[in-house]
Amino acid sequence: MIDKEKIKEGMKLILEAIGEDVNREGLIETPDRIARMYEEIFSGIGMNAKEHLSKTFEVHSNDLVLEKDITFYSMCEHHLVPFYGKVHIAYIPNGRVVGLSKLARCVEVYSKKPQLQERLTKEIADSIMEYLDAQGVMVVVEGEHMCMTMRGVRKPGAKTVTTTYRGKFLEDESLKNDVFRMISM
């Protein structure tokens, strides 16, 4: 559970530390706004994707399923600034599938907390393998990191791409190629 009072106190201290007047008209409600925003953007802390991936439907097909271009927003755990982009999830069912919105909810669970893109990619894949008992999973995450855009090297538009493979995707290069082709369609 997020402690909004601590966040408000901390935000006031930060504003004072950078030389701002916390009682100024434009800032007086900022600590409260930040606390409410953090409650939303860090709502994945302590959550598990199991509740979203546990309701499945029987299928008589083991054909590839791809949900692509799932938009995500997260916060870099190193600088607490946003990174955002698209997630592409491909999996090979093992007789059961999940509702497509549940894949997006899985992304939300793992992106709504201080995060690393590499870990986000792995957590999504691992949860789908575990809770769907999939024959294989491939996850591709494309992200733009504000820690590279607005500070440091200042390279707007630079994208980080991470991938991970589980099950049949580790063994079959043509499956990977099919997914990359489908993502680019």
Curated annotation (Swiss-Prot):
One of its GO terms (molecular function) is GTP cyclohydrolase I activity. Pathway: Cofactor biosynthesis; 7,8-dihydroneopterin triphosphate biosynthesis; 7,8-dihydroneopterin triphosphate from GTP: step 1/1. It catalyses: GTP + H2O = 7,8-dihydroneopterin 3'-triphosphate + formate + H(+). It comes from the Bacteria. One of its GO terms (cellular component) is cytoplasm. GO terms for biological process: one-carbon metabolic process; tetrahydrobiopterin biosynthetic process; tetrahydrofolate biosynthetic process. Disulfide bonds: none annotated. Its EC number is 3.5.4.16. Zn(2+) binds at residues 76, 79, 147. Pfam families: GTP_cyclohydroI. Keywords: GTP-binding, Hydrolase, Metal-binding, Nucleotide-binding, One-carbon metabolism, Zinc. Toroid-shaped homodecamer, composed of two pentamers of five dimers. PANTHER family: GTP CYCLOHYDROLASE 1, GTP CYCLOHYDROLASE I. Belongs to the GTP cyclohydrolase I family. This is GTP cyclohydrolase 1. It comes from Clostridium perfringens (strain 13 / Type A). The gene is folE.
